[in-house]
């Protein structure tokens, strides 16, 4: 009798300890659902759709009016062409500014709309709110920019070499390259998303910090090897399936292996989310000047 009582008490205590985690997961999923609707259906989403469609539109134009360059005349040269397009346009412009728009507005947009207090008055831990909002931005950016990456590959290859492209992607190395590019896009959304979440939380006008970060990422090829590692783009470029020359003025540095690059970005993201959660616990709402 005594043993069953102790077992019941132990089970109750264990359930009490586990119950908050179940509640936090439910609250996170609820926030995720609400924020996804905002991210995809609000007026702010229009700019995001235009940005995501930009590379696809440009490649569509190139499919109609193909250049005379040798790289466009054979399927083997297209891998270098896509590496150039992905590095300069998709990764450094579309994904970067798209993540800036999505993640900076997760909290900053609520302040501008004067609606953040609804969340803060709800019985939700601030850390749960941060995780739910971050996940919503992550899902939004990965879906949109992942589709941009794959659609850009399709628009570059298939209009020119339809049968060869089918064999290249479904039987050759193209499928693996497509997955790697998709993985790099995902990691970019994870890393840049964490950075711009913090920027949106700490700065009343996040545009200037975002431009400074953009400049730092762009001059990465000029930085000494140690400083290169203090950027997201270094780890992303290290994973490229088709490396691209950074020009004659680039400071040479060894690419960081994937087994270091991927965990480094994930650990960095966790640290930033912890900092964001700590900040929101002490955050007071003031709509003055917004």
Which residue ranges define each predicted feature?
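Junction motif at the cytosolic side of a transmembrane helix
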Residues: 3-7, 198, 267-290
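Aromatic- and glycine-rich beta-strand/loop motifs that create alpha-glucan
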Residues: 3-49
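Helix-loop-helix units of permease transmembrane domains in multi-pass membrane transporters
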Residues: 32, 105-139, 288
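Alpha-helical transmembrane segments and their helix-start/interface "positive-inside/aromatic belt" motifs
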Residues: 36-51, 137-138, 205-211
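Transmembrane helix-loop junction
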Residues: 38, 109, 122, 153, ...
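Membrane-helix interface segments
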Residues: 43-45, 125-127, 131, 173-174, ...
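Transmembrane helix segments
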Residues: 58-70, 203-245
């Amino acid at each position: 009798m005594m043993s069953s009582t102790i077992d019941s008490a132990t089970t109750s205590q264990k359930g009490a300890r586990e119950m908050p985690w179940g509640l936090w997961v439910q609250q996170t999923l609820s926030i995720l659902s609400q924020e996804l609707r905002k991210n995809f259906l609000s007026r702010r989403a229009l700019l995001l759709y235009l940005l995501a469609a930009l590379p696809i539109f440009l490649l569509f134009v190139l499919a109609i009016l193909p250049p005379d360059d040798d790289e466009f005349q054979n399927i083997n040269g297209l891998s270098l062409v896509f590496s150039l397009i992905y590095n300069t346009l998709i990764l450094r412009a579309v994904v970067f500014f798209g993540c800036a728009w999505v993640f900076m507005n997760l909290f900053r947009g609520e302040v501008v709309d004067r609606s953040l207090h609804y969340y803060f008055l709800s019985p939700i831990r601030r850390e749960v709110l941060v995780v739910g909002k971050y996940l919503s931005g992550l899902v939004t950016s990965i879906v949109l920019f992942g589709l941009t990456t794959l659609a850009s590959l399709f628009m570059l290859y298939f209009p020119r070499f339809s049968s060869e492209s089918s064999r290249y992607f479904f039987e050759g190395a193209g499928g693996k390259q497509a997955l790697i590019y998709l993985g790099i896009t995902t990691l970019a959304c994870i890393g840049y998303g964490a950075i711009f979440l913090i920027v949106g939380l700490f700065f009343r006008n996040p545009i200037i910090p975002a431009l400074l970060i953009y400049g730092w990422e762009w001059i990465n090829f000029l930085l000494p090897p140690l400083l290169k590692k203090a950027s997201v783009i270094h780890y992303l470029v290290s994973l490229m399936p088709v490396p691209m020359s950074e020009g004659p003025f680039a400071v040479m540095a060894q690419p960081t292996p994937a087994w270091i690059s991927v965990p480094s970005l994930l650990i960095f993201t966790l640290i930033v989310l912890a900092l964001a959660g700590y900040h929101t616990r002490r955050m007071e709402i003031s709509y003055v000047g917004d």
